[in-house]
Amino acid sequence: MHVNGKVALVTGAAQGIGRAFAEALLLKGAKVALVDWNLEAGVQCKAALDEKFEPQKTLFIQCDVADQQQLRDTFRKVVDHFGRLDILVNNAGVNNEKNWEKTLQINLVSVISGTYLGLDYMSKQNGGEGGIIINMSSLAGLMPVAQQPVYCASKHGIVGFTRSAALAANLMNSGVRLNAICPGFVNTAILESIEKEENMGQYIEYKDHIKDMIKYYGILDPPLIANGLITLIEDDALNGAIMKITTSKGIHFQDYDATPFQAKSQ
């Protein structure tokens, strides 16, 4: 897919990886809906982007992705404003083992809800023109982390859901591709608060283990993750792909054995 002229919706767009995604898409000529629960950060993000790009290229919408009605209204507002939707990036996420229900709701349930809403608007069988959905997972979605079992569960869920939904979208000839990104530790606000008691909960006594993991894996910068996003969007051959991004290998892909039964499109 050529990004120029397309309309993208990015959740968690006000800061960190989401903001890097938005800027990368704008640089490629897309129009971007900046979706975030943080009103102040969202307004500041749009103002900063307006200095680099034409103001009409972006739209900020405050939304709590865990609220299903707000999420539905957000998709409707984006399509009403820009007239279409071509690219969806389900990026919003938290890392909270103490309030683990919130972690599952934001990290996994909202990604599933967002994906289905995106398919409703983009699928060819619904009158759409096709498109692409990128779901943000993590290396924690491919490996266990003793101090973050619920976070791991949410990110593993994204990988399994994305791979399966990609097969389903192909089976239905929807014209929509789905891929996921699994980066290591990234220099964001989430990383800065990862070892706080309010996030680690019962695992707080093992915070030094997290620090050791960060030292071992290193820290990535958001623009590199944005490069991965653009690759997944522009390469039409990628569907159900799980992209890994690490300090040691950069951008690469998770290898999977072929499934014994592969559903075929009608």
Curated annotation (Swiss-Prot):
The record's GO CC annotations read: basolateral plasma membrane; cytoplasm; cytosol; nucleoplasm
- InterPro entries hit by this protein: NAD(P)-bd_dom_sf, Sc_DH/Rdtase_CS, SDR_fam
* Keyword Lipid metabolism in annotation: yes
Which enzyme class?
oxidoreductase
Where do the annotations place substrate binding?
138, 148
Which catalytic residues are annotated? 151 (proton acceptor)
**Name this protein carries in UniProt:** 15-hydroxyprostaglandin dehydrogenase [NAD(+)]
- UniProt lists the gene as HPGD
